[in-house]
Swiss-Prot record:
Signal peptide: none annotated. This is Protein C4. Belongs to the geminiviridae protein AC4/C4 family. Pathogenicity determinant. May act as a suppressor of RNA-mediated gene silencing, also known as post-transcriptional gene silencing (PTGS), a mechanism of plant viral defense that limits the accumulation of viral RNAs. It comes from the Viruses. InterPro entries: Gemini_C4 (IPR002488). It is found in: Host cell membrane. Its main location: host cell. It is a lipid-anchor. Keywords: Host cell membrane, Host membrane, Host-virus interaction, Inhibition of host innate immune response by virus, Lipoprotein, Membrane, Myristate, Suppressor of RNA silencing, Viral immunoevasion.
Length: 85
């Protein structure tokens, strides 16, 4: 049996009370390929701030941020630092 992978997703928008909670646990089979894709709005409204937090709990109990989260955060910081005319 493969390692236990548990992931919890939480999404919300700034001025909205709508929340999406999804929690799932599965046991990948040896050699099984897992692909997770996320899609975001290309041009979100200025008053809307999408927030997405993903936490992966490894079988040893440690939490790690996904590489995608780190890349998205870096991209967001670069975008907010660039001033447009």
């Amino acid at each position: 049996m493969g390692n236990l992978i548990s992931m919890c997703l939480y999404n919300s928008k700034g001025n909205s009370t709508a929340k999406i909670n999804d929690s799932s646990t599965w046991y990948p089979q040896p050699g099984q390929h897992i692909s997770i894709r996320t899609y975001r709005e290309l041009n979100p409204a200025p008053t809307s701030t999408p927030t997405s937090t993903r936490t992966e709990t490894l079988s040893n109990g440690e939490n790690s941020r996904l590489t995608l989260d780190l890349l998205e955060e870096a991209s967001r910081q670069l975008t907010t630092n660039v001033q447009r005319p």
